[in-house]
């Protein structure tokens, strides 16, 4: 089975084929997800909440992301592996270069950064030096205290236009993928149609090129707050691999996300 690359995902977008992504943090789960056909695995800073028990993602370090990236890398053969760059690990282009290099050396195929216009120089410099970038707009969890909580972004015309403009600028700067989180489906549609690169949604409706969820939500093992955009597939299937297959199938046929998982 051929490895998934950014070119693979671009081809999927051009063909109108929906693809799936999940977070993963260890070799065993990563191997199961990879074996069932998940296209993209993300070592997310969400590990700060679902593994470490923090209230947000801010305490996570680059060393911790690198550790889990090495674990996941050992478990996969096909999936594209993205590593999150944690809070304040890319405040300057120079800092971003150092930390992104560490994550690539740990086994990542790409790094993910949260932010808009202020990141353009960093995205360009990383890309020019051979480090592929996945950008992240909308609800960016590392900015949770700026937003005043985990809230839907881009509902008013001004902010929607800003997010759309930032998406275009990040693509022009060299980003190869874009994640949009917790934005209205209409805005996600506009972004997906405006960009050549693939767009991955989470809480952004069904029109993006791909979908991503946190594995703990898919398997129904999250504690505390359960996001509206998530779905417990283990509850309906009773087995982990079957849950992953159900997620892949529902994304492919357009039944997930449905209106109950979508914001307006």
UniProtKB/Swiss-Prot annotation:
Where in or outside the cell it occurs: the entry states: Cytoplasm
At the top level of its lineage, which domain of life is listed? Bacteria
Reactions performed catalytically: 3-methyl-2-oxobutanoate + (6R)-5,10-methylene-5,6,7,8-tetrahydrofolate + H2O = 2-dehydropantoate + (6S)-5,6,7,8-tetrahydrofolate
For this chain's record, the cofactor binding note is: Binds 1 Mg(2+) ion per subunit.
Instruction: Name its GO BP terms in alphabetical order.
Output: pantothenate biosynthetic process
Q: Where are the transmembrane segments?
A: none
Q: Give me the residues that bind Mg(2+), please.
A: 45, 84, 114
Query: What are the record keywords, sorted?
Result: Cytoplasm, Magnesium, Metal-binding, Pantothenate biosynthesis, Transferase
The cellular component terms of Gene Ontology attached to this UniProt record, alphabetical and capped at eight, are: cytoplasm
Identify which top EC class this enzyme belongs to. transferase
Pathways involved: Cofactor biosynthesis; (R)-pantothenate biosynthesis; (R)-pantoate from 3-methyl-2-oxobutanoate: step 1/2
Q: Does the keyword Metal-binding apply?
A: yes
Query: What does the UniProt function comment say about this protein?
Result: Catalyzes the reversible reaction in which hydroxymethyl group from 5,10-methylenetetrahydrofolate is transferred onto alpha-ketoisovalerate to form ketopantoate.
HAMAP family linked to this entry? PanB (MF_00156)
On subunit structure and binding partners, the annotation says:
Homodecamer; pentamer of dimers.
The name on file for this protein is 3-methyl-2-oxobutanoate hydroxymethyltransferase
Q: Which organism is it from?
A: Shewanella sp. (strain MR-7)
């Amino acid at each position: 089975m051929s490895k998934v690359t950014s070119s693979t995902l671009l081809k999927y977008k051009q063909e109108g084929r929906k693809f799936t992504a999940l977070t993963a943090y260890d070799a065993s789960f990563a191997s199961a997800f990879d074996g069932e056909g998940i296209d993209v695995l993300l070592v997310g800073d969400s590990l700060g909440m679902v593994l470490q028990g923090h209230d947000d993602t801010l305490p996570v370090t680059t060393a911790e992301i690198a550790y889990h990236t090495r674990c996941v890398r050992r478990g996969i053969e096909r999936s594209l592996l993205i590593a999150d760059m944690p809070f304040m690990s890319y405040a300057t282009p120079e800092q971003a270069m150092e930390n992104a290099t560490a994550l690539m050396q740990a086994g990542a195929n790409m790094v993910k950064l949260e932010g808009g216009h202020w990141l353009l120089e960093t995205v360009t410099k990383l890309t020019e030096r051979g480090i592929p970038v996945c950008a992240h707009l909308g609800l960016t969890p590392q900015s949770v205290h700026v937003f005043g909580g985990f809230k839907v972004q881009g509902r008013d015309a001004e902010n929607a236009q800003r997010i759309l403009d930032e998406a275009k600028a990040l693509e022009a700067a060299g980003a190869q993928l874009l994640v949009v989180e917790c934005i209205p489906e209409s805005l996600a549609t506009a972004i997906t149609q405006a960009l050549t690169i693939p767009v991955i949604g989470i809480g952004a409706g069904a029109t993006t090129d791909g979908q991503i969820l946190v594995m703990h939500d898919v398997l129904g093992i999250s504690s505390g707050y359960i996001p509206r955009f998530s779905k417990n597939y283990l509850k309906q299937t009773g087995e982990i691999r079957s849950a992953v297959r159900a997620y892949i199938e529902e994304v492919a046929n357009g039944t997930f996300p449905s209106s109950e998982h979508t914001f307006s």
